[in-house]
Design a protein with these regions (language model features):
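Active-site neighborhoods and metal-handling regions in enzymes and metal-associated proteins
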Residues: 1-126
Length: 126
């Protein structure tokens, strides 16, 4: 959701981030590595022309601490294992326009994933 009315560009950014996240989540499964997951979402954002405004990793593991391994980023070569819980959280931050980050918690399974977060991803201005 957004507080207040947003520009058309901000709404476009929201849609790009959402689609990048969805494409990344669809690739989650045991045996994929953090670099590949990052490459999928980051590539989508870059292809949309906003690559220079995405300046963090795609996500990370969560467990006893909120930030744990595995990392979902450009340099993480380890492979996802079934049973791990990770975040997928792309974001775009454009000066003078605003920033969007959409984060969901995802369980890695042998053949795919299960989204653990239960929150609407519909764009809403409040």
């Amino acid at each position: 959701f957004s507080i207040g009315k947003q520009s058309d560009e901000a709404k476009k950014i929201y849609q790009i981030v959402l689609e990048a996240q969805q494409k990344t989540i669809e690739a989650v499964k045991e045996g994929v590595n953090g670099q590949e997951l990052d490459r999928i979402g980051r590539g989508y954002i870059e292809d949309a022309g906003y690559g220079k405004y995405f300046n963090h990793g795609m996500g990370h593991g969560i467990g006893l601490d909120i930030h744990e391994l595995p990392n979902i980023g450009r340099t993480y070569e380890e492979y996802m294992k079934a049973g791990q819980i990770i975040t997928i959280e792309p974001g775009i931050y454009v000066p003078g326009v605003g920033g969007v980050r959409i984060e969901d918690d995802v369980l890695v399974t042998k053949n795919g994933y299960e989204i653990l977060t239960d929150f609407s991803r519909d764009y809403t201005e409040v």
